[in-house]
UniProtKB/Swiss-Prot annotation:
Similarity comment: family membership: Belongs to the SepF family.
Protein name: Cell division protein SepF
Gene expressing this chain: sepF
Sequence ranges of Polar residues compositional bias: 59-88
Primary location: cytoplasm
Entry-linked HAMAP family: SepF
């Protein structure tokens, strides 16, 4: 009832001629209340200044609100209420670490996939970048493509790997390993690659 009382004087609605038929008891109550409401709405309408340019009066009119009691509270009470709400919010931020470890384990198993690519044209590079964006490691073999296109592909993949925070490593002559940020590569074979290049020349 308190909520109803709060909004009882907020809007004034004028009765329209098109009314649905109500049971006889309700008709009697409505007939008693109708003159009171009409007189009340006419008094409020005459109190408001009339707008010359308006074509017809509106059926719903706003009534000024009473000042809320919450604005009358002292600042000390407000600070106390703020402190109570923040302590309740902090209590809800507790996270179960076992569930988080299980989710991380599931995600690691799900993303432990490596894709092998041997692009023939530069447009195949977009497929490699899509796999990197999906957090999958890719191994790219550039032995069957010309040197100019291979350089363009490596430049493109270097930018992609940089954007996602991953890494690109050379693991053979014209073979590159591109990894996203969730994959860590241990060890290096740089000496072996350099020896292979010197022997090939």
């Amino acid at each position: 009832m308190a909520l109803k009382d709060l909004f009882s004087g907020f809007f004034v609605v004028e009765e329209e001629d098109d009314e649905l038929e109500a049971p006889p008891e309700e008709n009697e109550q409505q007939e008693r209340q109708q003159p009171k409401q009409q007189a009340q709405s006419q008094n409020q309408f005459t109190e408001q200044p009339r707008n010359v340019n308006s074509e017809r009066p509106r059926s719903i009119q706003s009534v000024p609100k009473k000042q809320s009691t919450r604005l009358q509270q002292s600042s000390g009470e407000r600070k106390y209420q703020m402190n109570n709400t923040t302590s309740k919010n902090n209590a809800r931020n507790v996270v179960n670490m076992n569930n988080q470890e299980q989710e991380n384990y599931d995600f690691t198993q799900e993303s432990s996939k490596m894709c092998l690519f041997e692009p023939r044209v530069f447009s195949d590079t977009q497929d490699i970048a899509d796999e990197l964006k999906n957090r999958r490691a890719t191994l790219v073999n550039l032995q069957r493509i010309d040197k100019v296109s291979a350089k363009r592909i490596i430049d493109f993949l270097s930018g992609t790997v940089y954007a996602i925070g991953g890494d690109i490593q050379r693991v053979g002559s014209d073979i590159f390993l591109c990894t996203p940020d969730n994959v860590e590569v241990a060890g290096s074979i740089t000496d072996q690659i350099e020896n292979m290049e010197y022997q090939g020349e």
